[in-house]
Design a protein with these regions (language model features):
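Compact integral membrane and secretory-pathway proteins
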Residues: 1-158
């Protein structure tokens, strides 16, 4: 089914998923908060490994942590999804969009497994850490691209 701009609904869904995938790389994939004796500290890390935050926690983790997220892969797949949705022919496009979506979801699965979640309190100190919202948006973007591929395949077979 086409629209005024020449793109079908499946292509628009995959294009939107690719754009959301690119944006998600710059959102927090990991976040942590700690407080002790009324002093709070926080840290967040995006898909490209850029660390931001404040307080003691930032200083401790900036030196010792290695961030091996697959953000570049998700970024590249988002760009490829946009190119595939805009440039390829129908049958190849539908399969390529679906594969890109599955690979983006795979990037989410690899990263969600590598992030440990913790929440605890001891005396007057507390700490919470886990996956940031950007990582869940990666899964949404992958689902959008894969759904666009499935819709495109359905349109081709009709």
């Amino acid at each position: 089914m086409g629209t005024k701009n020449g793109f079908g609904n499946a292509q628009i869904l995959a294009l939107a998923g690719g754009i959301v995938s690119i944006i998600s790389v710059f959102l927090p994939w990991y976040s942590a908060k700690a407080s002790m004796f009324g002093v709070a500290s926080s840290i967040s890390v995006n898909g490209l490994g850029s660390i931001s935050g404040n307080g003691l926690l930032l200083g401790l983790w900036r030196e010792n942590a290695t961030w091996e997220f697959q953000g570049l892969g998700v970024l590249a797949l988002g760009i490829v999804s946009i190119a595939v949705a805009a440039l390829l022919r129908e049958k190849i496009r539908s399969m390529a969009m679906f594969i890109c979506g599955i690979l983006i979801i795979g990037g989410w699965a690899v990263n969600i497994r590598s992030i440990w979640e913790f929440s605890g309190e001891f005396m007057d100190a507390s700490m919470q850490s886990g996956a940031g919202y950007g990582l869940y948006i990666v899964a949404l973007a992958g689902a959008m691209v894969a759904a666009g591929g499935l819709l495109a395949w359905r349109d081709v077979t009709e």
